[in-house]
């Protein structure tokens, strides 16, 4: 199984007291079959940029620019034209279902469908019924 790791799963690993189950799940993954979206990098970077200066901010900035990018090196998927088309369809489907879907979540979901990846996320309810194969590391 090839996976796209959602931002909330990545963020869990950087918390001072992460959920043990999620950390164990992450450590058991076959790294070659795991990808992240450039959108997740943007979301995490925004969070770091909004933090007050200090050790925690410095540590997270280092984790993002050094550890995370090195770990996923050639496995960061950009938003390209195919993802953009899938995003438009996904957002329209969500709207027809009467559901709001955040743009960034939509881009991550579109990345998963475009690249035939299972989306590992805590927010499975946001994507239910939208044709995205889901896995919840907190529950599975």
Q: Predicted segment positions?
A:
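Acidic, PIN/NYN-like endoribonuclease modules and their adjacent C-terminal/linker elements
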Residues: 1, 107-140
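Active-site phosphate/pyrophosphate-handling residues
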Residues: 8, 21, 82, 106-107, ...
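Phosphate- and divalent-cation-binding pockets in alpha/beta enzyme and binding domains
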Residues: 21, 43, 86, 129-130
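A short acidic, often aromatic-flanked loop/helix-cap motif at beta-alpha or helix-coil junctions
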Residues: 42, 83-85, 140
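Active-site neighborhoods of divalent-metal-dependent phosphate/nucleic-acid chemistry enzymes
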Residues: 46-54, 70-119
